[in-house]
């Protein structure tokens, strides 16, 4: 019998790709914005009882950090109450919950190393605050719940699936338009190919309950990362100056969103390091890149 998986946020960048990947292998229940008000506890309980999924992958969120700062009430309803309601419904229904959390929890980190799940980090933004509070509440209600802290992700545009602004498409666009792209020097974060996240969700369904950093590690600044990926795209090196350093952003308080993934590695789940992940992604579809930027594409 196929496993029944319910995916909230199934019209989004991540949720849509999860649904597309597992379609056919599992029975997929797609839950979009118009299908369920996740901020309504009764509606969530009724929906889960009706669908009776084995696993709930909760991707639904307001993920734009600026929107959350400008409208904290909306963020609380969707990013805190929504996952808490899902945890309550999963407890009642006996479903396994995988909650998509965020590396933005580490936005206040002053550590000079990659962040670990149990590091005490001060809250500095609304989105990260609500994600952390949701994790805590989920595990209180549902100790076997799984909270996966995701990094910034990227992918090629895929017909029928939502695209989002990401480093890969931004770099390609800069090359196509022959315009400079500024990336911060005082910023370190992992950046993950979304397909790695999607595929690793299958073994993640069997993880012990808890919080896990779930994405690519990185020790490079965003500027250095972008420069290296751009070099993969520009084999002749004649457009390398398009990636320029942004010295101003985070100058007074360097940002460190980098994640230590030792915990999930110990459970047998691995991710490529950030630059290696970009290389594998580009190698998977060289014809797509060449159609956009022609002979500038590196020969892998």
Task: Please annotate each region the language model reported.
Residues 56, 70-98, 132:
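NAD(P)-cofactor binding segment of oxidoreductase domains
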Residues 155, 183-188, 212-220, 266:
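Glycine-rich Rossmann NAD(P)(H)-binding loop
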Residues 200-250, 255, 280, 289-300:
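Mid/C-terminal beta-alpha module of Rossmann-like enzyme folds, strongest
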């Amino acid at each position: 019998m196929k496993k029944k998986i319910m995916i909230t946020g199934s019209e989004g960048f991540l949720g849509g790709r999860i649904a597309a990947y597992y379609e056919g292998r599992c029975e997929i229940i797609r839950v979009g914005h118009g299908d369920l008000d996740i901020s309504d506890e009764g509606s969530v309980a009724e929906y889960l009882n009706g669908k009776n999924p084995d696993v709930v992958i909760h991707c639904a969120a307001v993920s734009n950090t600026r929107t959350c700062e400008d409208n904290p009430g909306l963020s609380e309803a969707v990013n805190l109450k929504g996952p808490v309601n899902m945890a309550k419904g999963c407890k009642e229904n006996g479903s396994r919950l995988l909650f998509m959390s965020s590396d933005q929890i580490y936005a206040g980190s002053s550590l000079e190393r990659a962040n670990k799940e149990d590091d005490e980090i001060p809250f500095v933004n609304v989105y990260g605050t609500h994600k952390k509070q949701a994790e805590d509440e989920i595990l209180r209600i549902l100790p076997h719940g799984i909270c996966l802290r995701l990094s910034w992700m990227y992918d090629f545009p895929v017909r029928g699936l939502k695209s989002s602004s990401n480093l890969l498409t931004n770099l390609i666009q800069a090359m196509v338009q022959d315009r400079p792209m500024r990336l911060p020097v005082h910023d370190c974060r992992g950046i993950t190919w979304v397909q790695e996240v999607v595929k690793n969700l299958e073994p993640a369904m069997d993880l012990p309950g808890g919080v896990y950093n779930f994405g690519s590690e990185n020790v490079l600044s965003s500027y250095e990362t972008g420069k290296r990926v751009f070099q993969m795209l520009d084999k002749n090196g004649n457009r390398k100056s398009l990636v320029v350093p942004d010295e101003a952003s985070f100058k007074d308080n360097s940002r460190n969103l980098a994640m230590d993934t030792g915990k999930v590695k110990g459970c047998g789940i691995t991710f490529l390091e950030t630059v290696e992940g970009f290389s594998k992604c580009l190698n998977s579809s060289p014809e797509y890149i060449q159609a956009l930027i022609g002979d500038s594409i590196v020969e892998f």
